[in-house]
Structures are given as structure tokens and as C-alpha cells.
Amino acid sequence: MAITHSVGDMLTKLRNASRVKHGSVDLKMSNMNKSILNILKKEGYIKDFNFLEKEGITFIRVLLKYDNKRNPVINKIDAISTPGRKIYSSYKNMPRIKNGYGILIISSSQGVITGKEAKDKKIGGELICSVW
């Protein structure tokens, strides 16, 4: 079965793997997934990620991050836009996630950025997901 929403699949795999306390999870490679993972790493939600190839297909191995009590750093990660329902926002109407404790990831004309960066640059875009 073909995956039509690679971002949604990635978010689900990250959520499920962190809930059962896996050390890592393998995801299908896509530029959007790579951009989102760069933000998650920069914001401290994952340890790291690297690329590996199995039978000619490139995967991304994500090393998940836990606190000192072995609780996942990612408490909740949810897709906002889907292939059938794209949600856009201007920088003025950008929603806050968990009263500023979470992050919003958006796809803008300047690439995939956080909601805070979008407000600072005064650009809007498609709301991809929220993380806290």
C-alpha cells in the first residue's frame, strides 16, 4: 500500500516509538521529513538523525530523546494539515502551542520553519504540525 501522506506517517511513527520508549525509529526519506527533523533536532525534541540505505531505498534513522526519568521529550506531536485539508495562516494569526511551550512547524516560501521564526520574518504558510 502506498503512503500518501509521508509527513503524517512520520509523525505517527515518532509518536508511537517514543511512547513505547524505543531508542530509534526508521522513516522513509523525503525532503519534507528531513526539514521537519532538522527543526526537531534544533529545538531539542530528538537526539539526532542519520541516513541509511536498505535495498536501494534511503531511510532516515531518528534517535529519540528521553529525560533522565526515561520519559519521552515529545509529549505530543500532531499533524495539522493533511493532503485533503491544507490549513494556512498569516503570521498575524499564527496559533500558540501550549501557551508558548510547544512549537509550530510551518511550510513557508522560505522553507520549513517554526512558527516563531515565521512571526519574526513576518511570513505565513501552511501549518504542518505542532509539537510539545
Curated annotation (Swiss-Prot):
GO terms for biological process: translation. The keyword Ribosomal protein applies. It comes from the Bacteria. Keywords: Ribonucleoprotein, Ribosomal protein, RNA-binding, rRNA-binding. InterPro entries: Ribosomal_uS8 (IPR000630), Ribosomal_uS8_CS (IPR047863), Ribosomal_uS8_sf (IPR035987). It holds the Pfam family Ribosomal_S8. GO terms for cellular component: ribonucleoprotein complex; ribosome. GO terms for molecular function: rRNA binding; structural constituent of ribosome. Belongs to the universal ribosomal protein uS8 family. HAMAP family: Ribosomal_uS8_B. One of the primary rRNA binding proteins, it binds directly to 16S rRNA central domain where it helps coordinate assembly of the platform of the 30S subunit. PANTHER family: 40S RIBOSOMAL PROTEIN S15A. Part of the 30S ribosomal subunit. Contacts proteins S5 and S12. This is Small ribosomal subunit protein uS8. The lineage of its organism: Bacteria, Pseudomonadati, Spirochaetota, Spirochaetia, Spirochaetales.
